[in-house]
Design a protein with these regions (language model features):
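Short beta-strand->loop micro-motif that forms the acidic, two-metal-ion catalytic signature
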Residues: 197-203
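Conserved beta-strand and immediately adjacent loop positions that scaffold enzyme active sites
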Residues: 31, 199, 229
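Fold-level recognition of mixed alpha/beta catalytic cores in primary-metabolism enzymes, strongest
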Residues: 1-65
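C-terminal nucleotide
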Residues: 40-188, 203-244
Length: 244
């Protein structure tokens, strides 16, 4: 398959999610699945669906997936609400600050200029989007430089913003990421997917996953009475035919 064919596959899967399932999600998950490359992260520009593969230094960290076992029962309706809130924020900024095609193109200075025209919820959602764009750019720089500590710190800052400004986290996700980040071998952690339950990831020192898993398991079980799941993963290729 060519990258063009994989792009078409991602677009088709996205249409199924938004048109049939009726969740107004972005196309990041479909892109990550269809266009993944072994040993690389994927930098996606959602405005025009352009993308870049960014090499991961394989010896720098491992990805520890942590499953809270909490079903994401609110993810669909709440995710649609976040999309609506972002559109409302964008409309205010276009009318009262400057006319830009995407919310992600605004700056912290633009949000300050909007003043009280943005409601508290609108400001929180816009703040997450604007600051997340800055974090992504900084994260790519750190990843290219092999600066895993800065990369991990940005990942955890992303989680905190997702929880406080975008409000798609939950107690289970906050606790499991905080427990992971309290371990010396962890560089950073954040929720994955739509939030409201499901999994988080932690970036951990190579070969040190078990030293993170045990205290996280004990702390999470003591808090919620649930045994979380764990798995160490690495960046692999996208979908392909398996032979024999």
């Amino acid at each position: 398959e060519t990258e063009l064919e994989r792009l078409a596959l991602a677009q088709l899967a996205h249409r199924a999610e938004t048109g049939y399932v009726q969740v107004e999600c972005g196309i990041m998950d479909q892109f990550a699945s269809a266009l993944a490359r072994a040993g690389h992260a994927l930098l996606l520009h959602c405005a025009d669906e352009s993308f870049e593969h960014v090499a991961i230094h394989g010896s720098d960290f491992e990805v520890l997936v942590m499953d809270t076992k909490k079903p994401r029962t609110l993810a669909g309706s709440a995710f649609n609400a976040r999309v609506r809130e972002c559109r409302e924020s964008h409309a205010v900024l276009r009318e009262h600050v400057r006319d830009l095609p995407w919310l992600a193109q605004y700056t912290a200075e633009d949000l300050a200029r909007a003043g009280e025209r943005l409601s508290g919820v609108q400001r929180a959602r816009a703040t997450h989007v604007v600051e997340e764009m800055e974090r992504v750019a900084s994260a790519v720089t750190a990843l290219v430089a092999g600066d895993v500590r800065t990369f991990g710190a940005l990942v955890h800052a992303s989680h905190r913003s997702t929880a406080t400004h975008y409000a798609v986290s939950c107690d289970e996700l906050d606790v499991i990421t905080d427990l992971a980040c309290a371990q010396p071998a962890t560089f950073g952690a954040r929720l994955t997917g739509a939030g409201f339950g499901g999994c988080a990831i932690a970036l951990v020192e190579p070969g040190a996953a078990e030293s993170v898993v045990e205290p996280v398991r004990e702390g999470f079980r003591a808090r919620f009475g649930v045994e979380p799941g764990f798995r160490v993963l690495h960046a692999g290729p996208g979908p392909r035919e398996l032979q024999g």
